[in-house]
């Protein structure tokens, strides 16, 4: 599979609103400007998503502006006890009013509504995530403050065109950020503490013009292998990926490009409903990513409102297997916490 690397800084879009150079990079070399988009403005989708995980519990925060609707989301997941709570307030016709930054490297993001607020502060060498929501769950309110540090020098960046003219997805995934902070939930102030020694975060930064109907597979993990920070991003399912895949390993702050990775979910692809809680496997065309996956918790969600539908299975669990770096070094991965998902959207 071809893997074209973008190595020069240039505008993401040309005068027509199409990608100037499809492919991948290890930093935000393509320059995104919302004003360069030359498509139906209601098809623009922008989001910042953070997930912090230590294998015992996880916190996920989203601020999204999908033009015809905005979505803010807070998820608390107890992986040891097997429960999760997700609340996702929506707003109508945000149309860029959320003012998500045109780069992940600078700018704060804030969104608030009735009885909640979410703030992502970008302080350069660290990021501070603050979220609060009254009546978050049956036990009461939630307050979270988490600081992310040790931001790696390299990340997964990809510019993917759709076959439809002027449609594209520009995406960055920053793995392996160290996380420190707490989540307090409920009347009894139950506290979940993220220790930077074993707690890591990923940022999913996405900007694009999407088609109406699509499916994606995405997997992400961050943790330690032999005492060193290691993680990966894997995924596929939408757009024209002939220029590059989004599959990448991260080790000691550096990115190592993979070719094609396939998700093997029990029952997926047939007429039967996939069994997301049975063990999965992952294979690669170049033999550099071979994993077994043990699910722990399926954060399942299905919303169907008229023409808008989203069927999501974000499955948290642990990865075991082997990964091979660019120089041939083999890393043996044991009980690495992460998640893998299949999402079907009509949006």
Regions found by a protein language model. Name each.
Residues 1-347:
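Structured soluble/peripheral alpha/beta segments that form catalytic or ligand/cofactor-binding pockets
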């Amino acid at each position: 599979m071809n893997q074209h690397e973008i190595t020069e800084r240039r505008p993401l879009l040309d005068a027509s609103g199409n990608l100037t150079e499809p492919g991948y990079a290890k930093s935000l070399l393509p320059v995104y400007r919302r004003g360069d988009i030359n498509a139906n403005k209601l098809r623009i989708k922008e989001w910042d998503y953070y997930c912090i995980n230590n294998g015992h519990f996880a916190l996920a925060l989203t601020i999204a502006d999908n033009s015809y609707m905005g979505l803010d989301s807070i998820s608390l997941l107890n992986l040891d006890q097997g429960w999760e709570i997700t609340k996702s307030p929506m707003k109508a016709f945000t149309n860029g009013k959320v003012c998500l930054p045109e780069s992940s490297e600078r700018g704060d993001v804030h969104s608030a509504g009735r009885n909640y607020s979410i703030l992502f502060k970008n302080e350069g060498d660290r990021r501070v995530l603050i979220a609060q929501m009254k009546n978050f769950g049956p036990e009461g309110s939630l307050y979270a403050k988490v600081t992310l540090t040790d931001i790696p020098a390299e990340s997964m960046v990809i510019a993917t065109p759709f076959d439809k003219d002027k449609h594209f997805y520009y995406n960055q995934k920053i793995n392996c950020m160290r996380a420190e902070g707490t989540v307090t939930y409920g009347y009894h102030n139950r506290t979940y503490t993220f220790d930077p020694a074993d707690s890591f975060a990923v940022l999913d930064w996405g900007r694009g013009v999407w088609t109406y109907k699509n499916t994606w597979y995405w997997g992400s993990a961050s943790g330690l292998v032999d005492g060193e920070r290691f993680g990966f991003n894997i995924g596929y399912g939408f757009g024209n990926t002939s220029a590059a895949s989004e599959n990448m390993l991260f080790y000691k702050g550096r990115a190592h490009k993979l070719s094609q990775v396939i998700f093997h979910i029990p029952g997926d692809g047939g007429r039967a409903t996939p069994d997301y809680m049975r063990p999965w496997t992952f294979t690669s065309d170049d033999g550099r990513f071979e994993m077994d996956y043990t699910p722990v918790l399926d954060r399942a969600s299905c919303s169907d409102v008229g023409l808008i539908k989203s069927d999501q299975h974000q499955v948290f669990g642990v990865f075991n297997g082997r990964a091979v770096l660019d120089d041939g070094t083999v890393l043996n991965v044991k009980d690495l916490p992460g998640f893998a998902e299949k999402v079907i959207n009509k949006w």
